[in-house]
């Protein structure tokens, strides 16, 4: 009787060993995939304009140029002021946005443009626009789709570089 019981116990143990081993392998594979997957890039935060680089290499800083940019989970608030030949210009914007590794979209809420020597421009018309996101080496590049804005590169370091060809390159620092 003892041999039969131990033989039965061995069969039960062997029958349980395969499913347990398979389960352990699946758990290990799932954990390794989970650790290997990076969370999606987040652009949430507050940014200040550190400096603007002009085509001739000149770096313009406060007080000639100041700016702040805030991304919440779904809103963007952008303000920038600069002086050119002693005349001030500014842009203010509020928009709703979505961002992922493939697409950036915005809905205009408010836009104001005060260019030196020109009448104020206000835009509160609802408009929904999209732009492709190009991911490379941890950076996300987006041609901002509203109001002719520059191309923005969201860096892996959390900072932003915004550029308009032959006009400027703005360097934005993320605040802690």
Residue ranges and their predicted role:
Residues 5:
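Short polybasic linear motifs
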Residues 34-92, 100-176:
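Lipid interaction determinants
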Residues 12-22:
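Bacterial N-terminal signal peptides that target proteins for export
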Residues 1-2:
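Methionine residue identity
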Residues 23-30:
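Bacterial N-terminal signal peptides
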């Amino acid at each position: 009787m003892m041999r039969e019981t131990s033989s039965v116990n061995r069969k039960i143990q062997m029958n349980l060993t395969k499913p347990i081993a398979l389960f352990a392998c699946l758990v290990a594979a799932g954990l390794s995939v989970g650790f290997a997957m990076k969370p999606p890039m987040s652009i949430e935060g507050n940014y200040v304009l550190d400096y603007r680089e002009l085509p001739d290499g000149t770096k313009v800083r406060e007080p000639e140029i100041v700016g702040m940019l805030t991304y919440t989970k779904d809103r963007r608030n952008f303000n920038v002021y600069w002086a050119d030949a002693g005349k001030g210009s500014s842009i203010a914007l509020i928009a709703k946005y979505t961002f992922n590794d493939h697409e950036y979209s915005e809905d205009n809420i408010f836009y104001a443009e005060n260019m030196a020597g020109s009448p104020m421009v206000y835009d509160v018309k609802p408009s929904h626009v999209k732009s492709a996101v190009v991911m490379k080496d941890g950076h996300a590049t987006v041609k901002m789709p509203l109001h002719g804005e520059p191309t923005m590169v969201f860096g892996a370091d959390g900072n932003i570089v915004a550029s308009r060809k032959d006009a400027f390159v703005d360097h934005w620092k993320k605040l802690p």
